[in-house]
């Protein structure tokens, strides 16, 4: 038991050398936020404006151009401005990035936009407008 204590103490003393290395932090790639299965509901004037869902959100707020990255895709549902629950359009993509300073979104990979067409003030959907793309920008 005494021998084990001496060996342990010797190991501890010799393992604490002066090989301290400094690590340089690259703020452009330093993740400051990570969230899984995030859902955000945006309200304007008491009315639901949109619901945003992402399986993974990673934020880089210390970068020169701060951004949020959605590497596992996004799903966005917008609502008509005159209703609490009437869906207006949906956007889905495999990947997205949001540049905070420019307030600019970029979606990539199997981007699908589906817009529900209605006559003004009506709740009946008269048709759908579908757009398929590999990339979409909006602000």
Task: Go through each PLM region and give its residues.
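C-terminal motif of bacterial Sec signal peptides marking the signal peptidase cleavage site
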Residues: 12-15
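Bacterial N-terminal signal peptides that target proteins for export
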Residues: 1-3
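Terminal module of membrane-associated proteins
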Residues: 6-7
